[in-house]
C-alpha cells in the first residue's frame, strides 16, 4: 500500500515538474487588400445582420475587425479595432466567422495573411440612401461590407 502511494506521489510530482515549451509565433504584418486577394479568394462572404436593437433605435455605426486567414481558409485571431456599439461588433464577428477563402494558385502553400475589414451599418429612411461618409473615417479598412437597415415612416 505504501509502495503504491509512494509511486503515485512520485508520478504526480514528476508530472507537475514537466514544463511545456512555449511556442513563439512571429506576428504577421497587416496585408493590404491587393496582397490578400493575391493569396486568397473568397468562397463565401455574407454581409452581417443588422442588429435588431440598433435598427429599432435607428442607430448607424461601423466596426473594423482585424483577423488572420489561416491555412484552412478561415478567419482566426479576430480582434475588434474600433470601439463601436457592442451589437455592431458582435454582428460583424458572427458574419466573419462564417466566411471562407480558397488559396489562389500563387498561394499553393496556403500561407496565412493578416487582413482587416470595415463593417458599416447604415439605415435608409423611406427609401432614401443612407449617408455613410463619416463611417469610413471612424473605422479603418480598405475592404468594406455594408449592412443596410430600412426604416419606413407613415406620412
Identify the residue ranges that each predicted region occupies.
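Charge-biased low-complexity segments
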Residues: 16-155
Amino acid at each position: 500500500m505504501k509502495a503504491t502511494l509512494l509511486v503515485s506521489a512520485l508520478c504526480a510530482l514528476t508530472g507537475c515538474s514537466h514544463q511545456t515549451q512555449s511556442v513563439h509565433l512571429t506576428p504577421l504584418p497587416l496585408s493590404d487588400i491587393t496582397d490578400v486577394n493575391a493569396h486568397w479568394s473568397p468562397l463565401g462572404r455574407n454581409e452581417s445582420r443588422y442588429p435588431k436593437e440598433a435598427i429599432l433605435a435607428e442607430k448607424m455605426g461601423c466596426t473594423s475587425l482585424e483577423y488572420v486567414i489561416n491555412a484552412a481558409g478561415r478567419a482566426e485571431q479576430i480582434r475588434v479595432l474600433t470601439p463601436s456599439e457592442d451589437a455592431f461588433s458582435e454582428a460583424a464577428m458572427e458574419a466573419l466567422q462564417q466566411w471562407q477563402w480558397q488559396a489562389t494558385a500563387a498561394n499553393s502553400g496556403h500561407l496565412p495573411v493578416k487582413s482587416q475589414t470595415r463593417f458599416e451599418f447604415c439605415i435608409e429612411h423611406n427609401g432614401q440612401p443612407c449617408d455613410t461618409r463619416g463611417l469610413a473615417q471612424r473605422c479603418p479598412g480598405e475592404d468594406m461590407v455594408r449592412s443596410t437597415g430600412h426604416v419606413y415612416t407613415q406620412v
